[in-house]
Amino acid sequence: MNKAIEEKEASSNTYPFGKGGFKIDKLTEETEKRYLRKEEFELIKNSPQENFILERARRLFLFSYYCFGMSFVDVAHLTQGNIKLLESGEYIVYKRSKTQNSKAAKPIKIPITDTIKDLLDWFKQNTPLTGDYLLPVVTKKYFGEQLYDHIRTRYKRINNDLKKLGRILGIKNLTTYVSRHTMAMMLQGQEVPREIISQVMGHTDLATTNTYLDSFETNVTDKVAQLL
């Protein structure tokens, strides 16, 4: 994108990660960070939908969760080129779009478990995939500003689909971002060290992870207080 701006093929005013630009994580700022209780997540996991649109949204949610809470924009950009055969097996390897230009950013390596492979196979067999994209988020061969606008539209649409799914299952405000929050809290609940959680989330420093997880603590203590 920087090169495109330099060559005047794109405008710096709409640079996706610059001031005033496209920030998919904040397209629709959530007033409250939400994560699912274990039983709510299990309900989503075990509730396949006959409606294809809702089933696609459900599986995208699960894919994000099992890929260490991968953000929607990174899910959207995954291609065959992100699948790498390493010594210990196949991995999805990528850098977060949000921090890829940071010197501290490192590639995230996600082992392709049987669950992830099953999800990828389902998308390949049941949805039209564009070009080399792994998932049915980007549906047209767009580039530059058109691509970011397209992802913005798809982000809103899939979140609407998830909210419909949530209403069916009795889960409020289900969105793609909830999968990331849920993954982080599930790991913390299993006493995974925050250093590891920080690494799999692609945070460039532990302070970001601490702030991120600490933001949930009030919600947790509030719920505990209601039990007394």
Question: Can you say where each PLM-predicted feature lies in the sequence?
Answer:
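Short, basic (Lys/Arg/His-rich) helix/loop patches that form interaction surfaces
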Residues: 150, 159-199
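Active-site/catalytic core of tyrosine-dependent DNA strand-transfer enzymes
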Residues: 41, 113-171
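N-terminal DNA-binding recognition helix of tyrosine site-specific recombinases/integrases
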Residues: 1-17
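Basic, Lys/Arg- and aromatic-enriched nucleic-acid-binding interface segment
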Residues: 15-30, 34-72, 76
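Short, polar N-cap/turn motifs at the start of nucleic acid-interacting alpha helices
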Residues: 82-90, 171-173, 192-211
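Short, contiguous acidic/charged loop-to-helix segments that flank catalytic cores in large enzymes
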Residues: 49-51, 97-111, 145-154, 172-175
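Conserved tyrosine-mediated DNA breakage-rejoining catalytic core shared by Y-recombinases
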Residues: 77-121
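Catalytic-site neighborhood detector that most strongly recognizes the C-terminal catalytic loop/helix
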Residues: 27, 35, 98-100, 201-226
